């Protein structure tokens, strides 16, 4: 009993006694945590060998350059070889370090512009090289143009076996307009089909570049690639900037990190930026505290400072949470210096030109689809998003893209990275409606297209977008390509031979025809040897109409499209015959029609199930026979009048599949 009381007494006294920690001396440092980053004088000093080397390099030994080429001419592979030569990555293998997306590696294309910093010792002196790997496809031209603004020169890369292609020409003129110094490079000289002499002649005739300055390489094997770096140092000019001037920082790109918020890829034109600096946006007026600055080497490598002439990344603390605040082309400066600097020339906001509707296969997956789309939009602000609803397919989204490849890449990323099961409608383009009261309206959703009565009474004219397409292909396919363009309502603008066997053909085409698998048809007509590039050519007056699919005279809202009047009959017949294949028979007759307003352009009928009501009758009982048939007929009419056609969800999925 005494032992129990002693135990209780000890426990109660221990509960009242303060913990016996050793007392803190006055000299002991006390650590406090704070969300903001204090300005530390030690951060001004280089803390690593890499920073010491970079700090010792003056701006006249900086080189900012990119690689200009047609899609699939070897830009990313050449980037890997340059990173290996400078010791930025370990040699061996085709890593495609700058292609970070799964879809980029799978398709062999570059979608997002990436940058990497390299240190190169040339004749005993260190040089700081910033390489930007840009997309080659026309759909990602916004990525290309913003990359060029951060560079002083470019390697103009041409495949030795394919020669100059359409996007080589288009990207050359973009780089030329930015005033970049161009260095000709012939790639894939190791291929049996390589013809470097022909490629050099094409570059001389098309771009007026001196073939003697060209470097012949094989990015795959590394042959002759080591000659490129001295060429970059000698021919590409150093950036212009003064690190003692007020900060002028151009936003080139941005992406989203779960832990750091929006990360900005920036080019410093004047001044310098450090962790702890208070900076502001000239476009939005918002102000931020810099959390970290650094370079891509090849991953994010923190630095004490980014100086004039450098390309690097920054993020803020507290973080920038909304990617809409990061406006590409915006100028940032330190708070208090806004009136001391002029904003840098920005970029035009990209305009969506191809629209699709996306619906989940299972309606219960809508929240997951919405979350997946919003996550991808954090890294791609060129996509427009609007919620919409369909009676046939349920809740979904209308998405706007820069082009068909942009749309296809986004769809692949939804499926691969987020496991989304989705139904995508065929791509459509915007149309312009000019009303009699003078107002103009751009319509991106076929469901909002004016009805027939409104068209007659209130609309002055309808317009559709046109593009100027540049096609390059061998001369032997000229007849087929012209026939294809003419059948797609094209208007020829120019025809020239830039070599004895290669043709550059320019046509003005409706964008609606271009997104309707025009490139696939072009590849088929030229056995895969043609290339295509295009640019906007304005709006044209056009005879267009809204084609709808009706099931028992009820419009199917998920299947409607604005098309040219010349395509109405053909597309209507295709629709009704294809839809008939996927609709099950009912207890009553199902009529499938394609219509423009009240005008029916095509029709298919699905016969009902038929019960043999005459099975038990005697052959001679004509009156009873007629009576039963009439009763069955009346029953079908009544069922057709009040019954709803049951169309399975998978029928729409199969109908909308490519």
UniProtKB/Swiss-Prot annotation:
Which PROSITE patterns does the record associate with it? G_TR_1 (PS00301), G_TR_2 (PS51722)
GTP-binding: is it a keyword of this entry? yes
**Species in which this protein is naturally found:** Paracoccidioides brasiliensis (strain Pb18)
GO function terms (MF aspect): GTP binding; GTPase activity; mitochondrial ribosome binding
State the UniProt keywords alphabetically.
GTP-binding, Hydrolase, Membrane, Mitochondrion, Mitochondrion inner membrane, Nucleotide-binding, Protein biosynthesis, Transit peptide
Record bears the keyword Nucleotide-binding: yes
| Swiss-Prot/TrEMBL catalytic activity | GTP + H2O = GDP + phosphate + H(+)
What are its GO cellular component terms?
mitochondrial inner membrane; mitochondrial matrix
Query: Which cysteines does the record link by disulfide bonds?
Result: none
Q: What residues does the tr-type G domain cover?
A: 60-240
GO BP: any one term: translation
Enzyme superclass (EC): hydrolase
Q: Which CDD domains match?
A: EF4_II, EF4_III, LepA, lepA_C
* Transit peptide boundaries: 1-40
> Which family does the record claim for this protein?
Belongs to the TRAFAC class translation factor GTPase superfamily. Classic translation factor GTPase family. LepA subfamily.
Classification via PANTHER family: TRANSLATION FACTOR GUF1, MITOCHONDRIAL, TRANSLATION FACTOR GUF1-RELATED
- Kindly provide the name given to this protein in its UniProt entry: Translation factor GUF1, mitochondrial
């Amino acid at each position: 009993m005494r032992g129990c009381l002693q135990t209780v007494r000890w426990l109660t006294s221990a509960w009242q006694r303060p913990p016996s920690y050793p007392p803190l001396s006055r000299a002991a440092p006390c650590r406090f945590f704070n969300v903001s980053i204090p300005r530390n004088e030690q951060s001004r000093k280089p803390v690593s060998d890499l920073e010491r080397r970079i700090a010792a390099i003056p701006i006249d030994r900086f080189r900012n350059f990119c690689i200009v080429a047609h899609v699939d001419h070897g830009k990313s592979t050449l980037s890997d070889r340059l990173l290996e030569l400078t010791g930025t990555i370990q040699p061996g293998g085709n890593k495609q370090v700058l292609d970070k997306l799964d879809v980029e590696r799978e398709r062999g294309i570059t979608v997002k512009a990436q940058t990497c910093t390299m240190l190169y010792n040339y004749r005993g002196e260190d040089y700081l090289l910033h390489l930007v790997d840009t997309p080659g496809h026309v759909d990602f031209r916004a990525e290309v143009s913003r990359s060029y603004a951060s560079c002083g020169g470019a390697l103009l890369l041409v495949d030795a076996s394919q020669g100059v292609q359409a996007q080589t020409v288009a990207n050359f003129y973009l780089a030329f307009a930015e005033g970049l110094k161009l260095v000709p490079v012939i790639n894939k000289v190791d291929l049996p089909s390589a013809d470097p002499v022909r490629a050099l002649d094409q570059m001389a005739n098309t771009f007026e570049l001196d073939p003697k300055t060209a470097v012949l390489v094989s990015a795959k094997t590394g042959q002759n690639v080591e000659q490129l770096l001295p060429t970059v140092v000698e021919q590409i000019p150093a950036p212009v900037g003064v690190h003692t001037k007020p900060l002028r920082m151009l936003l080139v790109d941005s992406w989203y990190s779960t832990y750091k918020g929006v990360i900005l890829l920036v080019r410093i034109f004047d001044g310098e930026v450090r962790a702890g600096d208070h900076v502001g946006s000239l476009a939005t007026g918002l102000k931020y505290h810099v959390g970290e600055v650094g370079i891509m080497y090849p991953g994010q490598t923190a630095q004490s400072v980014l100086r004039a002439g450098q390309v690097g990344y920054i993020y803020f603390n507290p973080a920038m949470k909304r990617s809409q605040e990061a406006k590409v082309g915006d100028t940032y400066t330190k708070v208090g210096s806004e009136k001391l600097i002029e904003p840098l020339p920005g970029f035009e906001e990209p305009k969506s030109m191809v629209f699709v509707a996306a619906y989940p296969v299972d309606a219960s997956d809508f929240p997951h689809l919405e979350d997946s789309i919003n996550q991808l939009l954090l890294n791609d602000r060129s996509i427009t998003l609007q919620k919409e609803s369909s009676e046939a397919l349920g809740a979904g989204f209308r998405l706007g893209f820069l082009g068909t490849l942009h749309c296809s890449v986004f769809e692949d990323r939804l499926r691969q990275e987020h496991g989304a099961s989705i139904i995508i409608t065929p791509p459509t383009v915007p149309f312009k409606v000019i009303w009699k009261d003078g107002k103009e309206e751009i319509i991106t959703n076929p469901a909002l297209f004016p009805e027939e009565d409104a068209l007659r009474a209130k609309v002055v004219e309808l317009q559709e977008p046109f593009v100027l397409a540049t096609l390059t292909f061998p001369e032997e396919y000229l007849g087929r390509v012209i026939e294809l363009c003419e059948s797609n309502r094209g208007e020829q603008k120019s025809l020239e031979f830039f070599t004895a066997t290669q043709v550059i053909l320019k046509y003005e085409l409706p964008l609606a025809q271009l997104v309707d698998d025009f490139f696939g048809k072009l590849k088929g007509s030229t056995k895969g040897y043609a290339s295509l590039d295009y640019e906007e050519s304005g709006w044209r007056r056009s005879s267009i109409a809204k084609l709808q699919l009706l099931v028992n005279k009820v419009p199917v809202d998920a299947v409607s499209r604005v098309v040219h009047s010349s395509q109405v009959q053909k597309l209507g017949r295709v629709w009704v015959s294809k839809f008939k294949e996927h609709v099950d028979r009912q207890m009553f007759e199902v009529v499938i029609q394609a219509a423009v307003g009240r005008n029916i352009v095509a029709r298919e009928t699905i016969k009902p199930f038929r019960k043999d009501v005459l099975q038990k009758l005697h052959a001679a009982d004509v009156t009873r026979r007629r009576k039963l048939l009439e009763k069955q007929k009346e029953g079908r009419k009544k069922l057709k009048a009040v019954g709803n056609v049951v169309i399975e969800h998978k029928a729409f999925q199969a109908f909308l599949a490519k």
